[in-house]
Amino acid sequence: MASPSKGNDLFSPDEEGPAVVAGPGPGPGGAEGAAEERRVKVSSLPFSVEALMSDKKPPKEASPLPAESASAGATLRPLLLSGHGAREAHSPGPLVKPFETASVKSENSEDGAAWMQEPGRYSPPPRHMSPTTCTLRKHKTNRKPRXXFTTSQLLALERKFRQKQYLSIAERAEFSSSLNLTETQVKIWFQNRRAKAKRLQEAELEKLKMAAKPMLPSSFSLPFPISSPLQAASIYGASYPFHRPVLPIPPVGLYATPVGYGMYHLS
């Protein structure tokens, strides 16, 4: 049977750790209760003096923790590899929110686009792009068809043009009535014939220029042949029965200027 002093020692405040209520007695039931209380104390405070003085083995309740951590570490990689699939399967609620917000945003953007694109109030009216038109010259709608002249009319017009290229008003009226033509037709025919004659004249002049153009420029042409006696007399003087010795003359080149001909020594 425990003495009162020992019971008071159990409740002494100097001891570290929480107070332990004394058991009922020294019987077998009291020993089991003290052991259970001690086990609870050790499990609740693993770093207390009693736990350090005990067998220094981790309590049975704490033993499953490393296994759980190991299992968590083993399953961490598959969870990371699975990605968002598991989270989407377990939490379908947040999936609805993005779609709802996206739909709201799209509606808001459509409203904003309609507000920004409203013509007449906030933006200038859109330009209507005209389709690309053909660049060919279009004839007038009220243009008269081209009148075909007969052979006799053409011959008469050509003879009249050779006689006189410009007709007065009276001459044109008389000539048009003789050919059963209008004054406008005669006037236009003479205008076209004068333009044609001018083109033909320019072509003939160009052809004559090309035919008269020599192979060498005219500035290098000599006024007399080199082998003529006039050229020898002009260079060496008059010819005598007895020829005097001729001094050596350096080679010379002839060149022409707009005024006349000149000579220069070739180096």
From Swiss-Prot:
Keyword Transcription applies: yes
Keywords in alphabetical order: Developmental protein, DNA-binding, Homeobox, Nucleus, Osteogenesis, Repressor, Transcription, Transcription regulation
Pfam family, one: Homeodomain
Molecular functions per Gene Ontology: DNA-binding transcription factor activity, RNA polymerase II-specific; RNA polymerase II transcription regulatory region sequence-specific DNA binding; transcription cis-regulatory region binding
Gene3D superfamilies (UniProt xref): Homeodomain-like
Tagged with keyword Repressor: yes
The protein's name in its UniProt record: Homeobox protein MSX-2
